């Protein structure tokens, strides 16, 4: 082995961290960054700087480089690509050796890949577009506490999407009135009701009171309908200790599912809660509150497909994914891409859906995709088509806004869903024939007929801010 020598000074990043001839290993963690460089900084130097600063490099040569094998540990920028339709930025592909990261710690992966490098002056803007976990790393992570099949078996619900509802108004109700709203929606035909992301333990409704009244509602609805029901009890709390206290109480009162805000609450807390749920037979619903602060800017931040991909090994049985047709951001192609990343065992590279790498999840179970945000009965045919069976379709205002009340709103959604599932089984095209399918079902359901009348003019037709960059073919 050649003797290493030390020369003080500053060298260009590209001398060590730009390797266009590098062939990524099966064990490498791969990342695709969208880089907008500062004026005067060439592509290779900016990409190499990102590789260095997100792995083991720094701004100057240090003598302690001689004490390790940098050729083994360093990140390597190995490919650059143009961004279709945008000449201000480009894609940089970087490979990281697996031994740079603690096993089973998505927290540690994020600390490097989206850490201080995002404030680096050599780049004007930086966005993590995609990430590939090698199967060797996937095997060290806990993943969803239970997954799709186990949840269906626990609830005895098969062959259709599940139906949910976020209780509104999201803030201000007393615990007793909150529980009453849950009961009406559950007895009307929903599978789940849900705490909104910002319901924790406020003066108007303390968490223990809410848990008690809600579980009374769940159990009463189960007795009346003969179906398993649930409510996502949000255990997100000021401290991990308080979070586990709330989770333990949910278990004590026989709740089947709890909820966590994984970005606001933190990935460390989320992984710990997922482990607790796995060990205690509790399902875990994940809300993505705060995601748009991170992912909506198309040039700086983290794409939501990465936030989806990081959640799966961290742990969650459900994840909010947007709706395509509702009030929240998300185009159809991209949404289908990250739904697959959440649910499928293997997802191949597909640039038409924004997927830059093959992703093999091995035997790690998948989670339910949750569609929520501005949806109502008219959206049902499209939602069933887009999301398929392994999803939870959550109608908040689209349940509670029914003129006849929560139970009628829930019943309308259940009738619409079952009509779409039946029509799909008959080979009908749900999106093309949706109006006819719903109209026929409404002839036998006054609740659905009124719901269709109420929301027939409601649309959310705004331009998507974060669009797929796909070359014209």
Swiss-Prot record:
Catalyzed chemical reaction(s): 2 (2R)-3-phosphoglycerate + 2 H(+) = D-ribulose 1,5-bisphosphate + CO2 + H2O; D-ribulose 1,5-bisphosphate + O2 = 2-phosphoglycolate + (2R)-3-phosphoglycerate + 2 H(+)
Binding site for substrate: 116, 166, 170, 288, 320, 372
One annotated GO molecular function: magnesium ion binding
Pfam families per the UniProt record, alphabetical: RuBisCO_large, RuBisCO_large_N
Residue spans crossing the bilayer: none
N6-carboxylysine: residues carrying this PTM: 194
Family per record: Belongs to the RuBisCO large chain family. Type I subfamily.
Function recorded in the entry: RuBisCO catalyzes two reactions: the carboxylation of D-ribulose 1,5-bisphosphate, the primary event in carbon dioxide fixation, as well as the oxidative fragmentation of the pentose substrate. Both reactions occur simultaneously and in competition at the same active site.
Note: The basic functional RuBisCO is composed of a large chain homodimer in a 'head-to-tail' conformation. In form I RuBisCO this homodimer is arranged in a barrel-like tetramer with the small subunits forming a tetrameric 'cap' on each end of the 'barrel'.
Protein's UniProt name: Ribulose bisphosphate carboxylase large chain
